[in-house]
């Protein structure tokens, strides 16, 4: 389900003080600086096999929220996984952890927000959980809710 993008500041003005605005300060990495879509989630720690499996499945404009426990020790997403996500219809990735291939990510037509970078690869054992509620920056990301992301931040409705 493709969602029309709305600026996060406009959503805050419309929703008011009860808005679900993520307090974490993510950096932009992908070729799109704004994106919106229904949320899917993966929780994994320094292992990206499960998220690669999820991103291999077609999406109609979804946003994958990846809880990597904030680890900057290894990258969960690089250019290969980002291109896979773009090719299967995902519109955005929110990574509570690190990415790599930062220069290449800027050229891929997908939104990517992450805490930072590390060139080190993650493991690939498949450990983790999917479609679970994830709380980041005071906001709970619930599968099926809608995430809006731009240069001002991330809103969940």
Swiss-Prot record:
Keywords: Lyase, Metal-binding. NCBIfam families: NOT-MenG, PRK09372.1. It comes from Mycobacterium tuberculosis (strain ATCC 25618 / H37Rv). One of its GO terms (molecular function) is metal ion binding. Catalyzes the aldol cleavage of 4-hydroxy-4-methyl-2-oxoglutarate (HMG) into 2 molecules of pyruvate. Also contains a secondary oxaloacetate (OAA) decarboxylase activity due to the common pyruvate enolate transition state formed following C-C bond cleavage in the retro-aldol and decarboxylation reactions. The lineage of its organism: Bacteria, Bacillati, Actinomycetota, Actinomycetes, Mycobacteriales. Gene3D superfamilies: Ribonuclease E inhibitor RraA/RraA-like. Substrate binds at residues 78-81, 100. Its EC number is 4.1.3.17, 4.1.1.112. This is Putative 4-hydroxy-4-methyl-2-oxoglutarate aldolase. It comes from the Bacteria. Divalent metal cation. One of its GO terms (biological process) is regulation of RNA metabolic process. It is an enzyme of class 4 (lyase). Its cofactor is a divalent metal cation. PANTHER family: 4-HYDROXY-4-METHYL-2-OXOGLUTARATE ALDOLASE 3-RELATED. A divalent metal cation binds at residue 101. It catalyses: 4-hydroxy-4-methyl-2-oxoglutarate = 2 pyruvate; oxaloacetate + H(+) = pyruvate + CO2.
């Amino acid at each position: 389900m493709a969602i029309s993008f709305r600026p996060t500041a406009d959503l805050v003005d419309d929703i008011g003080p009860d808005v679900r605005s993520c307090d974490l300060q993510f950096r932009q990495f992908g070729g799109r600086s704004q994106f919106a879509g229904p949320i899917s989630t993966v929780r994994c720690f320094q292992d990206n096999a499960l998220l690669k499996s999820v991103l291999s499945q077609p999406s109609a404009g979804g946003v994958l929220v990846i809880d990597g426990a904030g680890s900057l020790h290894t990258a969960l997403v690089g250019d290969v996984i980002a291109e896979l996500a773009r090719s299967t219809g995902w519109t955005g990735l929110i990574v509570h952890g690190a990415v790599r291939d930062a220069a290449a990510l800027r050229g891929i037509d997908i939104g990517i927000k992450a805490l930072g970078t590390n060139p080190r690869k993650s493991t690939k054992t498949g450990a983790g959980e999917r479609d679970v509620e994830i709380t980041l920056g005071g906001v709970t990301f619930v599968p099926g809710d809608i995430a809006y992301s731009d240069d001002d931040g991330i809103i969940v409705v």
